[in-house]
A protein has these predicted regions:
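Long beta-strand-rich cores associated with HINT superfamily self-processing modules
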Residues: 511-536
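Surface-exposed binding/hinge segments that line
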Residues: 82, 126-176
Length: 536
């Protein structure tokens, strides 16, 4: 096992930068200072479908719909809607809304955003079904025409945020900024939304300052005038900043520090189950792995190798040692809260001896070498989980070179814009629609850019079974809940039989919050501070 040593220098630089920034942040009942382990990569709301990034963007941009504190879909820039028939939706847009630069919000912005979000470079193409045709009825009415019924259409739109057409055109930002971009676009460094806050300044890797939007169309639920966001990669520095009062909110709190924060008398940890599933994936599409000692073929195309990896991973040990009990081992690629038949599935037992035998049968009695991609500032104890997996695979003869990177570099490498450059990886997924269809379509769907560029968009390893695609299409249009759940079950059963992925667990939420602050914690782990209040 080897973790790239360059990470140390990057981490030190991040810590030093964070300390300098914090010292300059004002302490006030109207200023909330928030720190996260990861940075805000881009202000372009279509660059990265990642919970922390979406939460940041949702302070300044808005969608036609949004989710309330209980995760229910509610109106936002669309004040109402109705279905004229099962394939014809009509949306009535909110009048009198202004973008932060004063431009009026109209149907033209929705039409533009519907095209931009589906354009090359967007990480949100699957949020809008490819058969959806947008028609402008008038300046404040939009029709959406579908080829077939879609009862979860507006749930799929969660995370799709509306942009100002005029502003994008004027600033050469008609095309979305891909996650793999090495040169920032205007939209990646500036924002112009309709949301409750606007961004006064943005220094990537250092600090982003949000200011309250006095012209927001809705009724504010916060007493905040400013939010100062600072990325602090170091867990120890992040916790120290909370306990010293330098910041008011941190996410996540390291599991080992939860008791200390709760005992501090100045802060507490908000915990709860998260809807995110953490899992391992393998490159199943290439004929030869990009990063492996095996040449001329791909070991993962043999189901015995995939089964061996699955049975070599001890999720109970990860739960006990790495997650300190704050995780729930999973047999599925979806949280049990989102699928009622989850309890009908069980994980294959941890069995390293059987795993070793399977590798031998597959022609790898001495194992092989490969590289594992892992973020080190995205999920709870993500790098530690990967290190544990490396040790477990070593027991069956597989030598893993662990490449643990900050999420900016990680996602730029492994996502679609970067060419899915990974052989073995750790990822987390919360279905934006809070529905199993999202998992089957985005994570387990066959990639086919020519036929449907949205299917399998987040399927980094290229797993493909056409029977799952057929079932997924039936799931989308089925309105009978019992029949729909059975279709979902059939699809998951196929994926499990083929060892398409290795689900690990649902992680627990852990937000560190000053006793001066009250906020709402949702199970999707979006830190939405426009509901927060602070008292000195």
């Amino acid at each position: 096992m080897s973790v790239r040593q360059s990470l140390f220098a990057a981490a030190v630089g991040s810590i030093v930068g964070s300390i300098v920034t914090l010292a300059a942040s004002p302490a006030s009942s109207q200023v909330l200072r928030y720190a996260n382990q990861g940075d805000l990569k881009s202000l372009d709301p279509y660059t990265l479908k990642e919970t922390t990034t979406i939460a940041h963007h949702s302070h300044v941009y808005e969608g036609l719909v949004t989710r309330d504190k209980e995760l229910k879909i509610v109106p936002a820039l669309a004040e109402s809607w109705e279905t004229l028939d099962p394939t014809h939706w009509r949306f009535h847009l909110r009048k009198g809304v202004k973008f932060h630069n004063g431009d009026p919000f109209t149907a033209d912005d929705v039409m533009f955003s519907a095209e931009r979000v589906r354009a090359t470079g967007s990480n949100f193409t699957s949020n809008i079904p490819p058969d959806a045709k947008f028609v402008k009825v008038d300046d404040y009415t939009i029709d959406v025409m579908l080829d077939s019924p879609n009862p979860i259409l507006i749930a799929q739109w969660d995370g799709w945020l509306i942009m100002d057409k005029k502003w994008c055109v004027e600033n050469n930002s008609v095309a979305p900024t891909p996650a793999s971009a090495t040169t920032p676009s205007y939209a990646s460094l500036h924002e112009n939304g309709t949301g409750r806050f606007f961004i006064e300044s943005h220094q990537p890797g250092v600090k982003t300052v949000f200011k309250i939007n006095p012209n927001w169309w809705g009724k504010s639920e916060t007493n905040l005038k400013e939010i100062d966001f600072t990325p602090i990669a170091s867990a120890a520095t992040r916790v120290a900043a909370l306990l010293s009062g330098e910041v008011d909110v941190i996410e996540p709190v390291p599991i080992q520090d939860i008791e200390r924060v709760n005992a501090s008398g100045t802060a507490k940890v908000l915990t709860g189950p998260e809807l995110r599933t953490i899992f391992l994936g393998m490159d199943l599409s290439r004929d030869e792995l990009l990063y492996s000692s095996v040449k001329g073929k791909n070991p993962f195309k043999d189901v015995r190798v995939r089964e061996a990896f699955y049975k070599a991973v001890d999720v109970d040990l990860i739960q006990k040692r790495v997650m300190r009990g704050l995780s729930t081992p999973s047999a599925l690629m979806i949280a049990p809260q989102l699928y009622p038949l989850s309890n009908e599935f069980t994980r294959p037992k941890y069995d390293p001896d059987a795993a070793k035998k399977l590798l031998t049968e597959a022609g790898y009695p001495d194992g092989f070498e490969l590289t594992m991609d892992c973020p080190n500032d995205r999920y709870v104890n993500d790098s530690a989980i990967c290190q544990a997996v490396v040790g477990m695979l070593a027991r069956i003869g597989v030598k893993v070179d662990l490449l643990a990177q900050p999420k900016q570099q990680y996602f730029a490498k492994v996502l679609k814009p970067g060419g899915y450059k990974t052989s073995f990886f750790l990822l987390g997924w919360t279905p934006a629609s809070s529905d199993a269809h999202n998992v089957l379509h985005d994570i387990m769907g066959c990639r086919n850019d020519e036929k449907d560029p949205t299917r399998g968009e987040a399927n980094l390893g290229g797993y493909c079974n056409k029977d799952i695609d057929t079932l997924t299409d039936k799931v989308l249009v089925e309105t009978d809940a019992a029949k729909r759940n059975q279709l979902i079950k059939q699809a998951f059963e196929i994926g499990i039989k083929e060892y398409s992925y290795i689900p690990l667990h649902q992680q627990a939420l852990a937000w560190g919050v000053s006793n001066k602050v009250k906020l709402t914690q949702r199970a999707d782990n979006e830190v939405l501070l426009y509901w927060a209040t602070k008292q000195e």
